[in-house]
Structures are given as C-alpha cells and as structure tokens.
C-alpha cells in the first residue's frame, strides 16, 4: 500500500492541483466562489445556460442550481438543448429563435467565464467542445447579477 501513495497523490494532483492538472481546468477559485453563492443570489426556480467546459455544469453539482447542461456531454439531437448553442450568438437579433428555445427550456440566466488561462493553470482551461458558442457574451440583452473575477452570472433580458 505504501508504494501506491505517491502514485495516488500524483493522480489526484493531475486532476485537482491547478499547477499540475494534465487535461485542463474546469473551475477556478473565483468561479467556485461565485457558484457556491449562486443559490443565494438566484431565484429558487432559476435555470442557467452556460458552457459546461467553462464550469457551468458545476452550478448544478456544487451550487444546487438547475442548468441546461449538467455534464459536458452533448445533448440529444433534435432537442431544444441541442439547437440552443448555435442559436445563442443571435440573442436579441430580429428573427432569432434564441428566445423561443430559452423559453421552452425555462432559461432566464446565463453563466460565463472569460479566463481561458484558468487563473494561471499550467494547461489552462479545459478544451471547448460543442459548447464553444456558449462562451460568447452578447453585447445586449443581459443584465449582470453577480461576478467574481472572470466568472459572471447574468439575467437574460432580451426575452422579456
């Protein structure tokens, strides 16, 4: 057993230590602080949209807040959740289907994290997958609710 301790320690560090992560960081300290207090700043029935590859899925697992994407896996084709990432950049534009999709999913909030270096993590943020468009923060139609460092929670006002 004693021989395995260094291996286990290195394995844990490769996943959780920001200076030794091998794959990419999903959460920074700032994002974690925001997520931990999100339940106290959002309504109880809030549903949040955001890129799971930038930590949005942790709003559900750590913060207890409903999210559109609770994992980094892509949503089943043909569902509103599968269509929403490609529609998201058109929020507020005439003829956009974004608000229709958001309304079908009950989404009123958006989570963003803009620090691609993940607070100086050696490998930076985890690579984006199908959720890359969900890292774009529209210039209109959002109202800041709370932020910590590069992590922010927004109320979506474009669909009011």
Set out the residue ranges of the language-model regions:
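Extracytoplasmic
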Residues: 2-160
